[in-house]
Design a protein with these regions (language model features):
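Alpha-helical transmembrane segments in inner-membrane proteins
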Residues: 8, 45, 64, 69-70, ...
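Hydrophobic core segments of alpha-helical transmembrane domains in multi-pass membrane transport
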Residues: 3-10, 31-37, 58-64, 88-96, ...
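Transmembrane helix-bundle core of multi-pass membrane transporters
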Residues: 80, 84-151, 178
Length: 207
């Protein structure tokens, strides 16, 4: 299911012909944001509040990681393939740095299962299904992305920019804004994939 969500996240970027090869990095920073909240706030917050914060934090982290190369592409016409690919390695180093402080047990060089005793921050079962929330969230994003790309004005702008930026400018579409917005959406969804991996599946994080 997580792979499907990643594919959904990449859809608008690829439709715009922005070759986002940085999904791995966006997933890692989203997962790291989720893990940080589970570790530092898991035992001090009500579960619903913690879940919302984890979801929002992973979304924001992924969006930031997606917007960075989009800004450089929009204003300096950098190569997005290389830029997003290199950001993957930056994200890996950030997670590796965090693992040093989060390792459990000490000296293991792994985070281990986060909150294994309390299960704080773990997505609960839904309808008796362990991964029920994962399925529901992915289905919601699948349907939402279909509506967004097929029927919304922004989805139309993505398609036009992907076909021809000159045509988009002629149609008075703000190309720079479309690139940045679309990569924010793409990165944000990939960040949520990191949330599902950490909170809803493995309950740990690694590179």
């Amino acid at each position: 299911m997580v792979l499907l969500l990643i594919a959904i996240g990449l859809t608008p970027a690829f439709k715009m012909k922005f070759w986002n090869i940085g999904a791995e990095g966006q997933i890692l920073v989203g997962g790291a944001a989720t893990a940080a909240l589970m570790i530092y706030a898991g035992d001090s917050m009500p579960t619903p509040v913690l879940m919302i914060l984890m979801f929002v934090a992973s979304l924001a982290a992924g969006m930031i990681w997606g917007i960075i190369p989009a800004i450089f592409k929009a204003y300096f016409n950098t190569n997005e393939t290389l830029f997003t690919l290199m950001l993957n390695y930056v994200a890996m180093q950030i997670v590796t740095f965090c693992i040093v402080y989060w390792e459990n047990p000490a000296g293991s060089n792994t985070v281990g299962i986060i909150n294994s005793a309390t299960r704080a921050g773990w997505l609960p079962a839904l309808g008796g299904l362990t991964y029920g929330w994962n399925v529901l969230i992915v289905l919601a994003f699948t349907f939402g992305m279909y509506i967004y790309m097929k029927y919304s004005k922004q989805g139309y702008e993505v398609a036009v920019v992907g076909e021809s930026q000159d045509t988009a400018r002629y149609a008075r579409i703000n190309v720079k804004r479309t690139i940045i917005r679309t990569m924010g959406i793409s990165g944000g969804i990939c960040g949520i994939a990191g949330f599902l991996l950490v909170s809803g599946a493995s309950h740990t994080i690694s590179t």
